[in-house]
């Protein structure tokens, strides 16, 4: 059964009920969508993901449940998202700082800078970006990627918050980050169709 975390207790799960925002389409399916997308990432594409599942309230409303990968035996590992690692906050990056700053190329440079086994994690990151593109997840912003301290070194964290956002947004985008794949930005107008060549160059 589920219960609230008590004062002084380190929670090990995160529960996400259906969002209350009325501008989101098909709100009742958000939990199932995220669970399915995460399962496809893990089982079909071999992407390391946070453990997750669906649970239901007494009124049969679905909620998404995920296990925190930064907590083990009641102790929290150090984790930093890419917005923090790149130095972006609301104060210096604007209200949409996690979307309008940086690119996925610059995210890869963060991995190169902080991760000892950078080549391995950059490959994992590349595969995750490709998956986000083909699964129509345009919520892959800077705070949805993290490095986690596993022992005495940092590594790319398991993937989390993967969801097909095209089912819930009136105007979904190709990429969550305004610059897209490259630090110099991309032409994402109607005349440019993002495809294999873009990802080959990114790789």
Model region roles, listed by residue range:
Residues 1-142, 146-203:
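Anionic ligand-binding catalytic core segments
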């Amino acid at each position: 059964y589920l219960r609230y975390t008590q004062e002084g207790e380190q929670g090990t799960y995160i529960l996400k009920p259906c969002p209350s925002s009325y501008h989101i389409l098909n709100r009742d399916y958000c939990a199932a969508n995220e669970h399915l997308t995460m399962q496809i990432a893990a089982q079909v594409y071999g992407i390391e993901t946070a453990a997750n599942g669906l649970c239901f309230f007494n009124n049969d409303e679905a909620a998404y449940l995920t296990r925190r990968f930064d907590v083990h035996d009641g102790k929290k590992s150090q984790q930093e998202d890419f917005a923090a690692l790149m130095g972006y906050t609301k104060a210096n990056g604007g209200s949409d700082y996690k979307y309008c700053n940086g690119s996925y190329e610059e995210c890869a440079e963060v991995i190169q800078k902080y991760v000892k086994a950078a080549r391995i994690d950059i490959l994992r990151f590349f595969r995750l970006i490709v998956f986000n593109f083909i699964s129509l997840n345009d919520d892959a912003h800077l705070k949805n990627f993290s490095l986690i301290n596993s022992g005495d070194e940092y590594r790319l964290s398991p993937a989390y918050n993967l969801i097909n956002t095209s089912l819930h947004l009136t105007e979904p985008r190709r990429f969550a980050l305004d610059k897209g794949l490259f630090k110099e930005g991309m032409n994402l107008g109607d005349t440019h169709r993002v495809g294999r060549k873009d990802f080959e160059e990114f790789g």
